[in-house]
Design a protein with these regions (language model features):
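Pepsin/retropepsin-fold aspartyl endopeptidases
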Residues: 20-322
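Bacterial N-terminal signal peptides
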Residues: 7-15
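Positively charged n-region of N-terminal signal peptides that target proteins for export
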Residues: 1-4
Length: 322
């Protein structure tokens, strides 16, 4: 079985306040997608994490929407709640900061309902997380992660600006991507091509004038760059005295750096601020052209109203609203 690297990162003491809202009105984009047979659910923003309410095998819970996780995850502490069993493997847990000693488990959720849509026989890996426990637990993560494999399989449209995850139970609908592009570019969005490398989403980027690639990770609270690349890009910064924690490994110290411009594709973010830490070389992909140098996290995706179209492999970003 191949290595599986799970990338959610919790930035201890740096998380932003929660943001919940009532039922949302569908935007022109959402109405267009729903008209093509999509269903889905509203999620909430909690400490810079996108928390999706679900019902798994008849039991209520929530999953963190995580484009950085190649597959969906159920945390070991919630197996009993959902009436799930697990099969053991010899594969060690890999997180953003390296490999841990724990072994992954495998499970399958017979029915996973989200809003007005039900997915059948959703396969997931099982890992431990001491802070799990759903539903919208005030501290820690949720019952698991809704991962990239399911978003690709069901042609998800993830509308972060309007807090909606929409999926098509019959699979991808590539025919709707032209309409999505027309709606969003008219609204001032910039499209950025996504590529999949090693089970992770990558985007081209420029950090402080240095071209690179970033892994797009809604499960990372903040954008983080690897320390070695930060030196190459001549990023300064200061120690925060704070730590970031990933799945399977101990927390790592982080620095904060500011620089004039971060470009994601053709989209420009002025006066960017990022965190810097030592990331796992296996996650980044080594020294090849396809390697990444860090994670594009939830804070910039949220500030710029990100929309993901997993049918065409496109990320849309717009200027920050004043």
């Amino acid at each position: 079985m191949r290595r599986l690297t799970l990338v959610p990162i919790l930035f201890l003491a740096l998380a932003l306040p929660s943001g919940a809202q009532g039922a949302v009105a569908l935007t022109a984009l959402d109405q267009y997608v729903v008209a093509h047979g999509y269903g889905g659910a509203q999620f909430i923003l909690h400490q810079n994490a996108y928390r999706l309410p679900i019902i798994a095998n008849g039991k209520a819970g929530d999953l963190t929407i995580d484009t950085g996780a190649p597959t969906s995850v159920i945390f070991r502490a919630t197996l009993k709640k959902f009436g799930l069993s697990q099969e053991g493997t010899d594969m060690a847990v890999h997180g953003a900061f390296g490999k841990g000693s724990e072994k992954l488990g495998l499970t399958s959720v017979h029915q996973l309902a989200m809003g007005n849509c039900t997915l059948m026989n959703v396969k997931a890996v099982v890992v431990s997380d001491p802070d799990s426990g759903g539903v919208y637990r005030m501290y820690g993560l949720s019952d698991g992660l809704f991962g990239l494999r399911e978003m690709l399989k069901y042609g998800a449209v993830l509308d972060i600006s309007n807090h909606l995850l929409m999926v098509h139970p019959g699979g991808q609908m590539k025919g709707i991507s032209g309409g999505i592009r027309a709606i969003l570019t008219k609204q001032g969005y910039t499209p950025v091509d996504l590529t999949i490398t090693g089970g992770h989403l990558h985007v081209p980027a420029v950090v402080n004038g240095v071209s690179c690639r970033l892994l797009v990770d809604t499960g990372a609270s903040l954008t983080v760059l690897d320390r070695q690349f930060a030196r190459k890009a001549r990023l300064g910064g200061y120690d925060t005295g704070q730590y970031a924690r990933g799945i399977g490994t101990k927390a790592r110290p982080i620095r904060v750096s500011q620089f004039p411009e971060l470009k994601v594709g053709d989209f420009s973010i002025r006066n960017a601020a990022v965190t810097i830490s030592d990331l796992d070389p296996d996650l980044l992909g080594g020294d090849g052209k396809a390697s990444a140098v860090g994670l594009l996290g939830a804070e910039y995706l949220g500030l710029h109203g990100a929309v993901f179209d997993f049918n065409s492999g496109t990320l849309y970003l717009r200027p920050q609203k004043s």
